[in-house]
Amino acid sequence: MLRHWQLKCSEKALRKYRKKQKHFFCQATPGAGKTVLAATVASKLLEEDLVDLVLCFSPSLTVSDGIKKTFSKTLSCTFNGGLGSVGQSLTYQSIQFLSDDFWKALRNYRVFVVFDEIHHCSGSEIENANVWGQQVLTKVQELATYTLAMSGTPWRSDSLPIVMAEYNTPDGQLLVDYQYTLKQAIADNVCRSPKLVLVDNEHLSVTSDEKVESFSSILEMLKQTKTSYRSVIHNQEAMEYLLDLGCKKLADIRHHSPNAGGLVVASSVYHAQTIKKILCEKYSQTVSIVTYRHEEPLDEIERYRRDNTQWIVSVGMISEGTDIPRLQVCCHMSSVKTELYFRQVLGRILRVNDSMFQQAWLFTFAEQNLIKFAERIEQDIPESCMFAKMISQVDLEPYTQRNKLSEKNFLEELEHSYANLIWSNTTANNCNPNGQLSEFDELRLGTFKQRVISAFLA
């Protein structure tokens, strides 16, 4: 059965196509079910004999495989481009490798083309397009009878226009045919309401060239020294602290939903392997790992989706479009700090399932960009961003008494610090895994605090 928004959006798209209007753009929050929407529209177009074939393009093999499965189920046929199939799911990268015969053959058919996460393709014309955008503009755009472009995060970090998107003038705001926001999705119980925990530290010290500097926050340290954010996310004790929070929260959720899982987004393969070791050896967790260096990552993701393993550690393999509804906890330790990536990662824990306990928790460090992104996850709702007292390291429920919140105009900070905690850089000889000297001799993190941002409070 379709969700209400999927029904309304599909009806609107079909009305537009029936009027011979070629293009439809849908912006729907990550985790809302855009693939099911696209498959439904494709099914209706085939049923009404408005198209003969369906092509889907997406940014990764993981997403492409998910699309293939959803379309096969919805259309009740194979969706691999072979005999008896009505279409195929491909990656944007594969477009440039398809033969001329492939494109010539398609010209004999009416083709419905679905562009998933279209923001990966930039350019309003060939001159300002990226490689994927050029392929869409030169090989796909004119071929398609109808197109459906979809994105949960319809903007680009480089501020270039998205392929086939329309913008108003003069402010350049994206024009969409249908929009389904996170606020709407949470109200409809389509997505979980997220809680974001920003871990900061009040007594940091950086020792470099026999000079000791002290700072009251991660933000202050990063601004006033050459220490990089990577130094924080690669610090052994810092990793252990964030993972400890994640493990305790996952354990709490699994008391109610035994199949709940956690995702750790790492910055490199070495980082992911270190994180896996910590989770296994220090916290006795069961862990899967998927990176471009590991064999059969798609199979590993599928195994994790179906089994009861507690954690999956990923480097770029599980971000946008990856459908694992049992994920309810995320530890964000990636060095990528763009709002696009942040929201896509958050989207991995927002998909609802049949569990009665639909919490979603993201843990990360209080870095400047991440603070900003977290604060505006849902900035239009009053009292949506608050400081929350952490009752203990085990119980991470935010302090949310409505009569208390109503007394504050914007933010209320309720701090609870844990003293006598020192995170030291334990890497031998102050070298990183690549053998290069660190930017500092020692990083110590003492008293720390946690800030919780609870979005979409009722």
Indicate residue ranges for each PLM-predicted region.
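Inter-Walker segment of RecA-like/P-loop motor cores
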Residues: K68-L106
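Conserved Walker A/P-loop ATP-binding site and its immediately adjacent core
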Residues: T35-L45, L50-S72, S267-Y270
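Conserved RecA-like P-loop NTPase helicase motor core
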Residues: T286-M390
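Interdomain helical connector at the RecA1-RecA2 junction of SF1/SF2 helicase-like NTPases
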Residues: S159-P258
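Walker A/P-loop
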Residues: K19-V41
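Long, largely alpha-helical accessory region at the distal end of helicase-like NTP-driven motors
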Residues: I233-H234, A238-Y241, K249, N369-A458
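Conserved helicase ATPase motor motifs in RecA-like P-loop NTPase domains
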Residues: T29-G31, H119-C121, T138-V163, N189
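SF2 helicase catalytic motif II
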Residues: K104-L148
